[in-house]
Design a protein with these regions (language model features):
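Short, Gly/Pro- and small/polar-rich lid/capping loops
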Residues: 1-20
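N-terminal cap/recognition module
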Residues: 32-64
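Glycine-rich Rossmann-fold phosphate-binding loop(s) that bind the pyrophosphate
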Residues: 187-188
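N-terminal glycine-rich anion-binding loops that anchor highly charged ligand groups
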Residues: 23-36, 67-72
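Hydrophobic Val/Ile/Leu positions in short beta-strands of Rossmann-like dinucleotide-binding domains
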Residues: 182-184
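GHKL/Histidine-kinase-like ATPase module
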Residues: 13-18, 24-31, 41-43
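N-terminal Rossmann-fold NAD(P) dinucleotide-binding loop
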Residues: 191
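Glycine/serine-rich phosphate-binding loop and adjoining beta1-alpha1 elements at the start
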Residues: 64-178
Length: 191
């Protein structure tokens, strides 16, 4: 079995925090993979199955995603190890935020991920004391509502761009747009 520490290379991670709060029982992980282009950006997973190795790998993925998109962010990822439907999610989120506060938002900017919601991000930002500490907040706190379909719109733009490139390269015969069907697998914002 691969150890999280075997994932270290010249690109990162720069910081790895494993935190535990004896008052709540909260166990969490924060991996700040690379901040060469800006603070590490990545969601907070809240699930019983979270492992340090998973968070290492997801943080690296965020490094490459932000770099590929030309964003002024590096990569990072957070994880809280518990079923959010069983534990007191508010106290656990507050505890996680409190323990990683020194890194937010200068080195880490959180977001929603598996098991976290807009309300979790509101709790996180309030506990950090800085609304810039995360994205994915409710609209009342300056967030963009999911109902606007920003993620789905991004998928649509990416698909249209890919089709235009294929057409320009004359790689394949493309049917008329009205004859085209697309299948997207997944759940949540994208699916």
């Amino acid at each position: 079995m691969t150890s999280a520490w075997e994932e270290i290379d010249e690109w990162g991670p720069e910081k790895v925090l494993q935190v535990y709060d004896p008052d709540t029982g909260m166990k969490g992980v924060l991996v700040i993979d690379n901040t060469s282009t800006g603070p590490g950006k990545g969601g907070i997973r809240f699930a019983q199955s979270v492992t340090p190795l998973e968070i290492f790998r997801l943080a690296r993925t965020m490094t490459w995603k932000c770099a590929a998109a030309g964003l002024p962010f590096g990569g990072a990822k957070g994880g809280i190890i518990a079923d959010p439907n069983i534990v007191d999610r508010v106290s656990w989120m507050k505890s996680f935020a409190k323990m990683i506060r020194p890194y937010c938002p200068s080195q880490y900017i959180a977001a929603t991920d598996v098991g976290t919601t807009e309300l979790d991000m509101a709790i996180f930002a309030h506990e950090i004391g800085d609304m810039r500490a995360c994205t994915g907040k409710p609209s009342e706190l300056g967030g963009i509502p999911h109902e606007l379909g920003t993620t789905g719109y991004g998928v649509s733009v990416a698909l249209q761009t890919a089709l235009n490139i294929l057409k320009e390269l004359k790689i394949t015969h493309l049917p008329q747009r009205t004859q085209t069907r697309v299948v997207i697998q997944g759940f949540g914002n994208v699916g």
